[in-house]
Amino acid sequence: MASAKTYVTKFKSFVILFFAPILLLPLIILVPDKFARCAYVIILMAIYWCTDVIPVAITSLLPVLLFPLLKVLDSKQVCVQYMTDTNMLFLGSLIVATAVERWELHKRIALRMLLFVGTKPSRLMLGFMFVTAFLSMWISNTATTAMMIPIVEAMLEQMVATNVAVDASQRTMELLDKNKASELPGSQVVFEDPSVQKQEDEETKNMYKAMNLCVCYAASIGGTATLTGTGPNVVLLGQMQELFPDSKDVMNFASWFAFALPNMLLMLVMAWLWLLCFYMRPNLKKTCICCGRKKKDTEKIASKVLYEEYRKLGPLSYAECNVLFCFGLLIILWFSRDPGFMPGWLSIAWIEGNTKHVTDATVAIFVAILLFIVPSQKPKFNFSRQTEEERKTPFYPPPLLNWKVTQEKVPWGIVLLLGGGFAMAKGCETSGLSEWMARQMEPLSSVRPAIITLILSCIVAMTTECTSNVATTTLFLPIFASMARSIGIHPLYVMIPCTLSASLAFMLPVATPPNAIVFAYGHLKVIDMVKTGLVMNILGIASVFLSVNTWGRAVFNLDKFPDWANLTHINT
């Protein structure tokens, strides 16, 4: 039996890779329509994405091959989808994030904020979560987790070592007292209950679990707050521009931030309370002097570890100052471009009729280019005071970024993945597959929109535990957009909750890279992640549902079916 299982596992990739296209052939043979040929490509990509038989980024290139061969789209129409405005926005933000990581500005920000928060365990965990979430808004979730977890580990190791030292000192004092007491007539020696030591070991394990989980959860939650913070948000923006080109910039950096930041903070606080209750319940019995001493020593050592890590960074360098300036400039330009409640700098010279010539992508690429120009060292203009060695060096110092670092650090695969999603959306629209799916979903018009949103959010949250969150949103959003247009509800009322639900990957180590990084440290079992992650999924879906049905309605005007959703751009 074992050998048969091994044999099947060995050839699983081969079978899926070559037999999946063959088994799907009846679809295009029995239904000789363009939308069926498009469905063939999408189903095949979904199978390859979920099974990972070839790299996800390479699967994303299948539309370039199959859409022209099956006469769904011509090659020029497909290829242009891989460098859309949305992809350039994401690429620009990735380059800026690379500069932040290269000069370790994110580490300085993290340690400074943690020192400010304090070292009481509950506050420390909240501090780690807020710092991780904040950094994850601007740089990748994976990079944030990879940077934060070593800090957590170093701090916990020192705290545990301090606890052991305090316990040893306490036991020595007790032993001396008992030796003195034993010399008295009628005295009895009382031995320490081993259950006390066992309980302390369990508390230490729970502390490790809580601190590790809080980082990976905060990374996933924090990325939802900005339009470029995580892949699903970028997919939503791209699908809106592709499926609803007349939506008039309803989805931009400022409008998304106004909606998503409160939701992110709500989810973060709920996650903190849940982890605190599940792993770090305050023990009311611990009110004795020795426990108070241990607690103070633990807090002191945590503060010492954080301060030591911060000291290693040295003073703020010239390069860090310049990166901070570019980063701040990017955020200011994004928010002030077209804030909505007032005219932005876009209205000065870059609007002609209904055409907005400058988008968030323009700003991102501008700052990205700036990073290859701004120097990483202070230029020396006084030639008379330069040493012989300094005169041999070029006058203009090296820039903050160079191409070698950029091509190594930027995750180019996700750019292809996003492009594949936009190509799929274009194929759905052009082939008529979107409209066909919309007609099949017309019976849902009798169901309350809130119930539809809740059910779809649960489906997406379960799916994203098994496959990439970008692939999940890429597959589902065109279907949900067609359904919303068919039954007459605002497309964003369905698309936003499902986009956010794709980031609720809390239950499995393979669900998202931050989970895998934390799991690799060995403090967690799969069952630990499943137990806490299941409740986290429920809390996340509840938070998203509340957000969309309260301030989300005001930000995106979700109560009214928009005119731009009625317009179709389909050539069937």
Curated annotation (Swiss-Prot):
Entry-linked InterPro entries: Na/sul_symport_CS, SLC13A/DASS
Family indicated by similarity: Belongs to the SLC13A/DASS transporter (TC 2.A.47) family. NADC subfamily.
Keyword Ion transport: yes
A Pfam family recorded for this sequence: Na_sulph_symp
Single Gene Ontology BP annotation: citrate transport
Record's bilayer topology term: Multi-pass membrane protein
Predominant localisation class: membrane
Assigned GO CC terms: basolateral plasma membrane; plasma membrane
Location relative to the cell: Cell membrane
Segments traversing the membrane: 13-33, 53-73, 80-100, 124-144, 218-238, 255-275, 315-335, 357-377, 410-430, 443-463, 491-511, 532-552
Catalytic activity: citrate(out) + 4 Na(+)(out) = citrate(in) + 4 Na(+)(in)
Organ and tissue specificity: Expressed in liver, testis and brain.
Regulation affecting activity: Inhibited by Li(+).
Keyword RNA-binding: no
Domain of life according to the entry: Eukaryota
Originating species: Rattus norvegicus
Job description of the protein: High-affinity sodium/citrate cotransporter that mediates citrate entry into cells, which is a critical participant of biochemical pathways. May function in various metabolic processes in which citrate has a critical role such as energy production (Krebs cycle), fatty acid synthesis, cholesterol synthesis, glycolysis, and gluconeogenesis. Transports citrate into the cell in a Na(+)-dependent manner, recognizing the trivalent form of citrate (physiological pH) rather than the divalent form.
GO molecular function list: citrate transmembrane transporter activity; organic acid:sodium symporter activity; sodium:dicarboxylate symporter activity; succinate transmembrane transporter activity; tricarboxylic acid transmembrane transporter activity
pH-activity note: Optimum pH is 7.0.
Name of this protein: Na(+)/citrate cotransporter
